[in-house]
């Protein structure tokens, strides 16, 4: 296992943020962003995966029903 320094972790975090921004620009909400859903490849290239809970946002706002177990759009 490779130890990751702060620079590598920041690089990976910015890739994840960029991927989430890409989804938001296309009106999608991932709803399950977690380390287990981030695939790391060669040269620490990160891909956001597992869109099983993803939803297309049709309105400008997104709300959850009572008792929902996922966060609303932040």
Swiss-Prot record:
* EC number of this enzyme: 2.7.10.2
Q: What's an example Gene Ontology biological process for this entry?
A: cell surface receptor protein tyrosine kinase signaling pathway
Pfam families xrefs: PK_Tyr_Ser-Thr
Source species: Calliphora vicina
One GO cellular component this record assigns the protein to is: plasma membrane
> What are the protein's UniProt keywords?
ATP-binding, Cytoplasm, Kinase, Nucleotide-binding, Transferase, Tyrosine-protein kinase
- Single GO MF descriptor: transmembrane receptor protein tyrosine kinase activity
Name-wise, this protein is Tyrosine-protein kinase ABL
């Amino acid at each position: 296992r490779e130890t990751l320094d702060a620079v590598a972790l920041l690089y990976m975090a910015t890739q994840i943020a960029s991927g989430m921004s890409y989804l938001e620009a296309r009106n999608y909400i991932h709803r399950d962003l977690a380390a287990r859903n981030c695939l790391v490849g060669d040269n620490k290239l990160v891909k956001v995966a597992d869109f099983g809970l993803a939803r297309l946002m049709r309105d400008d706002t997104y709300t959850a029903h009572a008792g929902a177990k996922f966060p609303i759009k932040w």
